[in-house]
Amino acid sequence: MKTTRYSFFGTALLLVSIMSGCASVPMASGDEDAKAKSFTAAADKSSIYVYRNESFGGAIPMTVSLDGKLAGQTGPKTYFMWEVEPGAHEIASIAENTSTLKLNTKAGKAYYVWQEVKMGLWMPRSLLQEVDAGTGKKGVAECKRAQSNF
């Protein structure tokens, strides 16, 4: 009976350690981070921010794509910012599941997407959700900019 209890607590401790560890992802420069946090979109472009402001599931980097092209990976407290042509765009987040979000962007506007991390069966899951500018700016401010492939 005691052995079973210790095995249970040992397994639980291991799972908590894995779920709360920190993934390392390539980071953008401090200047790029500061520029993105000015939250100004170019008049002829749209800005898309994807942020992950939670530490939960931090041991697992999550792959993100924009319009079917690999953008990179997020870790805990990181974000991407992309300047894109106005129009239809699809963001995907790949973890234990694949979450997608379609945006129809307009020139001169910024869009904010929260990459929520949830408990999965074997590893964390993600859920992409568009949020309002106030919520998005606050979330991005809590994060550092990750290096993107574009």
Language model region names:
Residues C22-F150:
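Short loop/turn and low-complexity linker motifs enriched in small/turn-promoting residues
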Residues L13-V16:
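Alpha-helical transmembrane segments
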Residues M1-G10:
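Bacterial N-terminal signal peptides that target proteins for export
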